[in-house]
Every structure is written in C-alpha cells, then in structure tokens.
C-alpha cells in the first residue's frame, strides 16, 4: 500500500552474495527531475501516503541532495511518508540526515551483513566498524533513537567469532547512542538486528558455494541468541526451512519443473505465507520426483562444472565471478566501480561504453540544476500560511456499501476513503 519509486538500477559495490548487484549492472540513474515528477504523479493517481524508494543503496545516488530538495517541496505539506531502503554506512552523511529528517521517515537501516571485518572482506562489504559507528552517531544526533541492522548467517568461511561479532556490534551501537551528546536521552535506544540465512544465488561469486544444512543454520541462530544480553537489542531471524527451499530453487535446473507442478497438485500454492508453508510436504514432493534437495542447496560446485543458468548472459563474465570467489576465500576485497574498474564485463552490454566508471566509458554530466518547486507547491523553506486564515467549509458525504463491497473491513474502508480524498486534490 505505497508508491514504489525506482531511483536507480544497478550497484557499484559488488557484494559477493548479492544477485541484483551483478545482474543489474551497469548503474543507470534517473534524473532528479524525472523522480520528483514520477513521485508526485504516482501519489496523485493512487492516493497513497507513503513513497518507498527502490534501489540497492539510496545514499549512493549521485544526485541525492537535489532529489531530496525536490521532494521536500510537497511531501511535508501533503503528509507523505518517505520509506528509505538500507543505507551504506560509508556514504551516509550529516547533510543527508538533515535532509531526510525534514520529511516523515521510517527507522533508518544499515546493512553491515557480517559481524567482523574479516568476514566483511570475504563478502566484499567494504565498510568498517568506524564507519558504521559514525553513521549511527549521525542518526542519533538527529534525534532518532532506533536503527536497524541487516546481517546474514551461514556465509561462506564464517566462524563462531563472526557470529558473536554481530551481538558485539549491536552493543557498540547502543554505547554509541549514550556517547552521542546530541542524542535524546529521554527515550531508550533500540537496535533491531535482522539476520537472514545465506542463499547462494546465480550470477554471483558465491553461486558455487553451499548453503549450510538447516540444523547447522538453526545452531548458528541459537548461538547468536545466546550472545545477546541487552534488552535494548531486538533479534529477528528467518525460517531455516524456508531458506533451504529458496536455495533449492535458486540453484535449480529444469528438473525442478516437475516438483513445482507436483507442489501445485498437492496444494502448495500459498507457501509464501508462514501458516501455509509445510517443509515436510516439500521434502515428500522432492522424493516423489526423484530429486535430492542437498544436490541443489548444500554442495560445493566445482569451477569447471557447467551451471544450469550459463545459457543466460547478464553481462558479467563467468571468469570474473570465479576470480571473485577465489578472492573471497583469501578475504581479499575488491574496490567499488567508482574507485577502480574491476573488468567485470558489464560494459560490453552497450556499444557506447554504458558503464560510466569503465576506462573510456561515458561518465555523463554530474551537474544537475537545483530543482525549484512548481507554482502552487510548498517549498520546504518557505513560510507556511496560518491554517486559521483559510476559509473552512464543512462537507458531509453519505455513502453505502453494496454488493461485494459490503464485506470490506472497516480499516480498509477508512484507508480507501482517505486515498479518495488525496486523489481528488481537495484541500482537506
């Protein structure tokens, strides 16, 4: 129930577990003018009061300042909430925090992904604990008392020390809150750590790495839980059985088509909902089709084995993925595309050098004019008229719920009426 606005596509970072970061290369950004127009038109057309920014890292958008200035021209008065994706801690600045604090935002999210510097080098998450603490300090200084941290367990080359480091990092964030002079000490801090299970994905350097068995993943989750001793830390984790089924289909081949058909016949059609998911039923389906889940999810695939998805060319070369896999085993990080081209091959997708950071590529024009709100839009810095001076008219509406709509719930009805008012453009 929100507007989804794609800010840009692709990523310059190269996290070795992230499929979207590789298959969506090279980076392509929308201009701030296009984004602001699409956001306004979408809210006017749908009546939604929330805009969700869709991208891999909003703080990596090269024109974030101009974009947020354009949004501030109308979202504040329209009471439109801005939902932000996870931030890169190393590119999060006080200037960006000041801008997003001017609009109604949800809890800020950062994604360290691993609890130790060594494992972050393994997965190529090029951020340090100092950068994470600095980003959290900026958040707390702006009056926020909550942050979310995303992690993964079961990563390749992971140890118990890496898992315990997740709890230690969360505790350091709590300490950072109390060490920040500008923080609002009247409210208790809260750090939410959300830990997902590693799932090997095609077209990533970790596509050949195994997923840990469900019982091993469960042990890792329980171990992390035992390391958390502060009630100000909230721990969320994913279902290991669901993650294993996801891993089976992530690295599956055409033989899984028979399993999907059999699953539909067995009634497994709403398994995205936890109450309908039945892990044992899936095991029975695989057995009936003569398939071994461990073959797909839990084995290491040699470098010379042909993969089912090798017929798909996403632009990133197979040799590059294998090189990155070997660098991960030695905990060697690869710099971002902005710092140094790693010759991934994505630049071959377009004859005019689509990758802006590749040698000889078209870097484009980074100069973007400041966006001025259209006439009639409220500027974020402009003085707002006194509401008491506006003429007030009372309008009474009578309506009835008929037909199938007679069964609509009360909350859904209230939300529908609210969206109708927004779409009408009435100054309510």
Regions found by a protein language model. Give the residues of each.
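Ordered, soluble secondary-structure elements with a strong preference for glycine-centered loop motifs
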Residues: 29, 160, 211, 404-412
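Extended low-complexity, intrinsically disordered regulatory tracts
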Residues: 369-407, 419-420
């Amino acid at each position: 129930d929100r507007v989804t606005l794609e800010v840009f596509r692709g990523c310059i970072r190269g996290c070795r577990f992230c499929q979207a970061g590789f298959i969506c290369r090279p980076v392509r950004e929308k201009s701030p003018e296009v984004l602001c127009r699409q956001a306004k038109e979408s809210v006017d057309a749908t009546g939604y009061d929330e805009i969700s920014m869709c991208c891999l890292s909003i703080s990596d958008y090269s024109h974030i300042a101009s974009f947020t200035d354009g949004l501030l021209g109308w979202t504040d008065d329209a009471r439109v909430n801005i939902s932000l994706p996870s931030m890169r801690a190393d590119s999060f600045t006080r200037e960006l925090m000041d801008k997003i604090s001017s609009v109604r935002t949800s809890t800020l999210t950062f994604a360290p992904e691993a609890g130790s510097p060594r494992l972050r080098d393994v997965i190529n998450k090029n951020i340090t604990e100092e950068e994470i603490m600095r980003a959290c300090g900026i958040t707390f200084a702006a009056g926020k008392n909550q942050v979310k941290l995303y992690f993964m367990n079961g990563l390749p080359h992971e140890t118990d020390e890496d898992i315990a480091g997740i709890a230690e990092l969360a505790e350091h964030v709590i300490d950072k809150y109390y060490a920040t002079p500008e923080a609002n000490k009247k409210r208790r801090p809260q750090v939410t750590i959300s830990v997902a299970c590693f799932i090997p994905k095609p077209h990533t350097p970790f596509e050949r790495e195994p997923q840990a068995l469900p019982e091993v993943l469960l042990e890792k989750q329980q171990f992390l839980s035992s390391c958390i001793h502060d009630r100000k830390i909230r721990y969320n984790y994913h279902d290991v059985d669901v993650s294993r089924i996801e891993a089976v289909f992530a690295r599956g081949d055409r033989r899984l088509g028979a399993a999907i058909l059999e699953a539909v016949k067995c009634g497994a059609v709403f398994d995205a909902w936890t109450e309908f998911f039945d892990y044992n039923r899936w095991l029975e389906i695989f057995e009936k089709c003569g398939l071994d889940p461990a073959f797909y999810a839990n084995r290491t695939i040699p470098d010379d084995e042909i993969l089912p998805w090798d017929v798909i060319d996403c632009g990133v070369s197979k040799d590059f993925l294998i090189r990155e896999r070997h660098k991960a085993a030695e905990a060697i990080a690869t710099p971002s595309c902005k710092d140094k081209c790693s010759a991934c091959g994505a630049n071959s997708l377009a004859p005019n050098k689509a990758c802006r950071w590749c040698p000889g590529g078209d870097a484009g024009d980074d100069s973007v004019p400041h966006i001025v709100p259209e006439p009639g839009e409220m500027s974020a810095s402009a003085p707002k008229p006194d509401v008491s001076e506006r003429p007030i008219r009372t309008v009474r509406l009578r309506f009835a719920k008929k037909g199938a709509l007679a069964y609509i719930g009360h909350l859904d009805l209230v939300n529908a009426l609210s969206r109708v008012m927004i779409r009408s453009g009435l100054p309510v």
